[in-house]
Amino acid sequence: SEPSHRKEVVDDAVMEEIRGYVAAQYSDPELNVSVIAEKWNLSLSSLSRKYRAKMGHGLLDEIHMARLKEAHQLLAEGSTVKETAEKVGYLEARALVRAFKRYEGVVPSQLKGK
């Protein structure tokens, strides 16, 4: 017989749902892995582990990458680093600068000429 406790089911469809949610909500500064875990009623550790296993990178990375993708566009259009940071969900310009350094090895000012 089946065990009475409900096993957390995190299948590909759920991962894609979460990825879509991040793509739609990345500009919310409150968005983080805990918020997502709670929304899908999953434990933080389980969600993090399963997301990384399925997607090849962490859920927090997914959030940062979505923000940086939009930041590239805004910076290319002439937005300041401060304006861009606020529009893509970072509370401070330096958080955007840190994310660029971490994920792309450059600072936003190095992108201006590209």
Question: What is the predicted function of each stretch?
Answer:
Residues 1-5, 17-31, 51-55, 72-80, ...:
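Basic, amphipathic alpha-helical hairpins
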Residues 34-62, 86-107:
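Basic/polar phosphate-binding segments, predominantly the helix-turn-helix DNA-binding elements
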Residues 53-91, 113-114:
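Terminal helix-turn-helix DNA-binding modules in bacterial transcription factors
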Residues 1-17, 40, 53-65:
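Short, Lys/Arg-enriched, Trp-marked, Pro/Gly-tolerant hinge/linker segments that flank
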